[in-house]
């Protein structure tokens, strides 16, 4: 590229000088430099070195009205040779190419990072749409530790504390404790430990699963305008939407937790055989049926409006409801709220 530019500037490649001519030029260089850098002073062949400064720098240089030394300034009216114009065009093209390469590198790095950004966005959206999905895997060793702590000291290591320490939902803690309790009972019946090869394999390869990280419930709020008549003297401030969403999520999470515990207790009694759910268990006993009677209140209302329930025995006597019957009544009580379900399902 440099040789091409020199060719364009000079029009041709310089020929190598002969040896004799080169020696003559070399002998004349000191005299030529002396002649350019000095001028005769007193006529006796002396050199006046101080006058050499006037040959290169003038008053305009110090006043700032002239260009600096060594920087050629092209006048607008001065014609430019085709060779110089071609070299300038090539410099501009090189600068454009370098800028394009730099932009291409930045664009490639930005596009390559989109894969990680999309994965992070999908994880966040999945967490919002399906609460608790980030805690899809919990090691079996952690489950064993959770059950051991609760069994040794249930007063200290409650369900709430275990859920906080292991960063999982309270419903999951209940399920894990019941699962480990059933496994321990099964090992006691068999007289040997259960096969845990699958759990060991999963614990040894945790990179194939998403580690748990703070499960929680996120409420699904309707996206519609909410118009309210504000009182007189309202300053125009409103509550933070995130704070409102957090409070609603906590209320719904508490309701879901209570319903889960209720269903879990019923399933435990069902597994233990205390709940009769097949058709042969519904035959009439020899001494007769036991009925649940609900007495109306003062204003002829049922349930929480003033009525109370009791059991009527076949012999005509009555008694209060036991724990099993209270559980049945609570399961049959309708829930006066909207159905809580995960969004986008």
UniProtKB/Swiss-Prot annotation:
Entry-linked InterPro entries: GCD1_mitochondrial (IPR052851)
Span of the signal peptide: none
Pfam family for this entry, one: MRP-L20
GO cellular component: mitochondrion
Region: Disordered, residue numbers: 36-82
Keyword Mitochondrion: yes
Major location (coarse): mitochondrion
Claim: Disulfide bond is one of the keywords in the record: no
Annotated localization: Mitochondrion
Transit peptide feature, positions: 1-43
Protein task: Essential for fertility (male and female gametophyte functions and development). Required for the integrity of female gametic mitochondria. Involved in embryo apical-basal patterning, and particularly dorsal-ventral patterning, during early embryogenesis, and endosperm free nucleus positioning and development as well as early endosperm development, probably by modulating the expression pattern of related genes (e.g. AL1, MYB3/AL2, CYP78A13/GE, PNH1, HAZ1, MPK6 and OSH1).
PANTHER family recorded: MUCIN-LIKE PROTEIN, SMALL RIBOSOMAL SUBUNIT PROTEIN MS75
Protein name: Protein GAMETE CELL DEFECTIVE 1, mitochondrial
Organism: Oryza sativa subsp. indica
């Amino acid at each position: 590229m440099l040789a091409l530019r020199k060719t364009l500037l000079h029009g041709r490649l310089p020929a190598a000088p002969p040896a004799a001519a080169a020696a003559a030029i070399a002998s004349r260089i000191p005299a030529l430099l002396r002649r350019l850098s000095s001028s005769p002073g007193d006529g006796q062949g002396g050199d006046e070195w101080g006058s050499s400064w006037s040959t290169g720098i003038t008053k305009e240089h110090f006043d700032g009205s002239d260009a600096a030394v060594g920087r050629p300034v092209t006048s607008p009216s001065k014609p430019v040779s085709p060779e110089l114009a071609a070299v300038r065009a090539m410099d501009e093209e090189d600068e454009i190419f370098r800028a394009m390469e730099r932009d291409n590198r930045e664009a490639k790095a930005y596009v390559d990072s989109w894969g990680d950004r999309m994965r992070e966005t999908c994880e966040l959206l999945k967490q919002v749409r399906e609460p608790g999905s980030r805690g899809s895997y919990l090691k079996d060793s952690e489950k064993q530790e959770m059950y051991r702590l609760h069994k040794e000291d249930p007063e200290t290591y409650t369900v709430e504390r275990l859920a906080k320490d292991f960063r999982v939902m309270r419903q999951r803690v209940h399920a894990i404790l019941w699962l480990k309790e059933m496994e321990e009972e099964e090992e006691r019946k068999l007289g040997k430990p259960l096969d845990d090869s699958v759990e060991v394999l999963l614990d040894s390869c945790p990179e194939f699963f998403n580690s748990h990280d703070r499960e929680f419930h996120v409420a699904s709020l309707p996206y519609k305008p909410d118009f309210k008549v504000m009182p007189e003297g309202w300053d125009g401030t409103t509550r933070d939407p995130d704070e409102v969403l957090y409070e609603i999520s906590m209320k719904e999470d508490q309701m879901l937790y209570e319903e889960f515990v209720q269903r879990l207790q019923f399933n435990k009694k069902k597994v233990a055989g205390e709940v009769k759910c097949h058709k042969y268990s519904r035959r009439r006993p020899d001494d007769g049926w036991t009925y649940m009677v609900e007495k109306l209140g003062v204003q002829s209302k049922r349930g929480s409006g003033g009525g109370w329930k009791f059991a009527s025995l076949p012999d005509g006597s009555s008694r209060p409801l036991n724990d099993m019957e209270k559980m049945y009544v609570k399961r049959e009580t309708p829930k006066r709220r909207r159905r809580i379900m995960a969004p986008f399902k």
